[in-house]
């Protein structure tokens, strides 16, 4: 009989039957409205944003960033604040040669603005440095000028290469002329007497 009762019972699954869900819906409809609000408030979450900010983003956290103390690279602005500076529209238009000549003559004695600004800023920066730091900064700026003066280095290299090539050409010409003279003296020596050969040797030396 135990076998027959087991076969009559339905196998229960993990999922709820439709009959159980409909009965729960009827029961929930009978509940007052206040209980539904309590259930919704239990399901929703409230975030304490200030606590999250204080925990994960504290004010003293540096995020792995560090301050690098190195001399600033000079920036030279090409556009000036005065009216003489060319704007984009002026640059595209053709300028009359006489106007250009007058502007060049007027600007001939003036120093570029970026150099004036550089001198002013360097004076302000050097005032708060110790003598050792000033010397270190001066050496750094000198090395930077030497390093970034590549155009001069290329010109010097070209001059050295051309000088070496010119010297090599002269050496080759001298060897060729010396070989030619020795061949000429040998040919003349073959057709002359021993006394003539001695005279030729005395003349050449």
From Swiss-Prot:
GO terms for biological process: generation of precursor metabolites and energy; glycogen metabolic process; intracellular signal transduction; regulation of signal transduction. The modification Phosphoserine is found at residues 44, 87, 121-122, 127, 130. Residues 147-150 are annotated as: Required for binding PPP1CC catalytic center, displacing metal ions and inhibition of PPP1CC catalytic activity. Residues 121-130, 167-179 have a biased composition (Acidic residues). Phosphorylation on Thr-73 by GSK3 activates PP1 by dissociating the PP1-PPP1R2 complex. Phosphorylation on Ser-44 by ATM activates PP1 by dissociating the PP1-PPP1R2 complex. Heterodimer with PP1. This is Protein phosphatase inhibitor 2. It comes from Homo sapiens (Human).
């Amino acid at each position: 009989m135990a076998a027959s009762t087991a076969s009559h019972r339905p196998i229960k699954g993990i999922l709820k039957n439709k009959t159980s869900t409909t009965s729960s819906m009827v029961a929930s409809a009978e509940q007052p409205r206040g209980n539904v609000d309590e259930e919704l408030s239990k399901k929703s979450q409230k975030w304490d944003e200030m606590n999250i900010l204080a925990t994960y983003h504290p004010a003293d956290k540096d995020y792995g960033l560090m301050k690098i103390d190195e001399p600033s690279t000079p920036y030279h602005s090409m556009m000036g604040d005065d009216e003489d500076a060319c704007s984009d529209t002026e640059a595209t238009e053709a300028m009359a040669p006489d106007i250009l000549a007058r502007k060049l003559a007027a600007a001939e004695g003036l120093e570029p603005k970026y150099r004036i600004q550089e001198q002013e800023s360097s004076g302000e920066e050097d005032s708060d440095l110790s003598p050792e730091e000033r010397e270190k900064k001066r050496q750094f700026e000198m090395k930077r000028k030497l390093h970034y003066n590549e155009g001069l280095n290329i010109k010097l290299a070209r001059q050295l290469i051309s000088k070496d090539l010119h010297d090599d050409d002269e050496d080759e010409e001298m060897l060729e002329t010396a070989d030619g003279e020795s061949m000429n003296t040998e040919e003349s020596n073959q057709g002359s007497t021993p006394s003539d050969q001695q005279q030729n040797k005395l003349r050449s030396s």
